[in-house]
Amino acid sequence: MAKIVVIEDDLSFLDLLRVHLAGAGHEVLTAGDAVLGLRAVIANAPDLILLDLSVPYLDGFEMIEALRNDPATRNIPVIVLTGRGDDETYTRVHKLGAARLLTKPVQRDLLIKAIEGQLGSRQPHPGKE
């Protein structure tokens, strides 16, 4: 069982993610904005973060950058969930150090597989040592 922080401002989607991940055996902590999300990450040292790019207070890009610049959080895998599946978004999140980008709506099986893949291959993010 992994501890996962989910940061998503769409509360119905956030609840759906919580149900899917808990059903897959994970401990799930949720946050509806970036400030609460950062607090949850710092307080709980999760194994993985699911992050919507469009959350209040900090956008997802700023959030990834903040996570990668903090020694306590830099090696936590971040999977980005977004409705923006364009090449520019994909390139930018990967350059910032996100492990994966999944486009909404995401199928449950694909999400679980992506999470399991990241949990099975945790390693430091390049250039962020």
How should each PLM-predicted stretch be described?
Residues 52, 82:
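Active-site residues of response regulator receiver
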Residues 18, 62, 85-101, 113:
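Alpha4 helix (beta4-alpha4-beta5 surface) of REC/receiver domains from two-component response regulators
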